[in-house]
């Protein structure tokens, strides 16, 4: 009897020891854009716990943040990101064009691989001293604007395209008048930072400018961290549906053997837990149950999509942001 128990105990110890031996310590690198720092600081430990409970493997996720365009360039230049979570599809397309990501990447996850969305709003100082109410308020004489540089920042490109969409609607789809409106707006930009978080810091911490054109999530974060006694959010009548996108970096995950966990990391963003974390960090979730739960956090406004107004990112980039494009033309002083 005791001999049998001894054999059984030995077998259990051996099984436990083998599980310890087989458990892995995995590292992932998520190269992301500027304002997602807080989101992934909260999401990463939740995913790590989920993955360890599911597989026994421990995972450490490292983060890199910066302007979305600059981050894409860093991956193109050799930074070994397992996943990219960038501000817009064009930046991931740029990596795919160099062969590191499958060109059909956008079809691999739901909602065109955009697990959460945002839009573009205005952050103003308490009392709204310049009386900013909509896009046309931004071109009033004496209004100093802070927005990042579309050459380096994904959020800045969304800002620019949101302004252009308003210009079209306000001028009966007249593209020349829309161009004149956006030109007038950029003539009043005081600082063009390289990324969205830098622009927020310029406005919030350095006290420069009357209005910050910002991601909605970034504006809400500023309000909730610094207080409604310092800043207010102005939601314009119309803005763009901003869709930050995500992908595994195929070349890297196949080299490092991390495809399974990298894919699971992105898929978990669509889970109820992932969607809840997105909403808590002021991103608009996709899950309808979570949308309903947080409906009071996100004002209703008219939203247009990139495809409805600009065709696709390739067209928008070529016309507006490429060297010699419309942005270069209108930003000359």
Could you describe each region identified by the protein language model?
Residues 120-128, 243-260, 277-281:
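A bilobed periplasmic-binding-protein/Venus flytrap-type ligand-binding module shared by bacterial periplasmic
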Residues 127-133, 152, 165-173, 252-259:
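Short helix-loop capping/hinge motifs at secondary-structure junctions, enriched
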Residues 253-333:
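Extracellular/periplasmic juxtamembrane helices and adjacent flexible linkers that interface
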Residues 171-237:
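Ligand-binding pocket segment of bilobal, Venus flytrap-like solute-binding proteins
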């Amino acid at each position: 009897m005791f001999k049998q128990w001894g054999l059984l105990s030995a077998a259990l110890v051996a099984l436990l020891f083998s599980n310890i031996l087989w458990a892995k310590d995995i590292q992932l690198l998520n190269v992301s854009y500027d304002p997602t720092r807080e989101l992934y600081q909260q999401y990463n430990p939740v995913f790590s716990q989920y993955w360890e409970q599911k597989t026994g493997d421990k995972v450490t996720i490292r983060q890199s943040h910066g302007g979305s365009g600059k981050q894409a360039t860093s991956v193109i230049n050799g930074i070994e990101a397992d996943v990219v979570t960038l501000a817009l599809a064009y930046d991931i397309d740029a990596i795919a064009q160099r062969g590191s990501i499958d060109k059909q990447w956008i079809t691999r996850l739901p909602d065109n691989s955009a697990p959460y969305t945002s839009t573009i709003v205005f952050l103003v100082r308490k009392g709204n001293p310049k009386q900013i109410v909509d896009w046309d308020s931004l071109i009033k004489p004496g209004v100093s604007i802070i927005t990042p540089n579309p050459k380096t920042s994904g959020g800045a490109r969304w800002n620019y395209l949101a302004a252009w969409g308003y210009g079209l609607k306000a001028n009966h789809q007249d593209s020349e008048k829309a161009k004149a409106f956006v030109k007038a707006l950029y003539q009043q930009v005081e600082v063009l930072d390289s990324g969205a978080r830098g622009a927020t810091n310029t406005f919030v911490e350095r006290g420069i400018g009357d209005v910050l054109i910002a991601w909605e999530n970034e504006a809400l974060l500023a309000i909730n961290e610094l207080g409604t006694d310092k800043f207010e959010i102005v939601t314009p009548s119309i803005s763009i549906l901003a869709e930050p996108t995500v992908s595994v970096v195929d070349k890297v995950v196949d080299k490092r053997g991390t495809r399974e966990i990298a894919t699971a990391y992105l898929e978990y963003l669509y889970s109820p837990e992932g969607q809840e974390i997105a909403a808590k960090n002021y991103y608009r979730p996709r899950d309808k149950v979570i949308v309903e739960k947080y409906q009071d956090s996100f004002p209703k406004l008219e939203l247009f999509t990139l495809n409805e107004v600009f065709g696709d990112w390739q067209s928008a980039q070529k016309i507006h942001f490429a060297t010699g494009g419309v942005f270069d033309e209108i930003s000359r002083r």
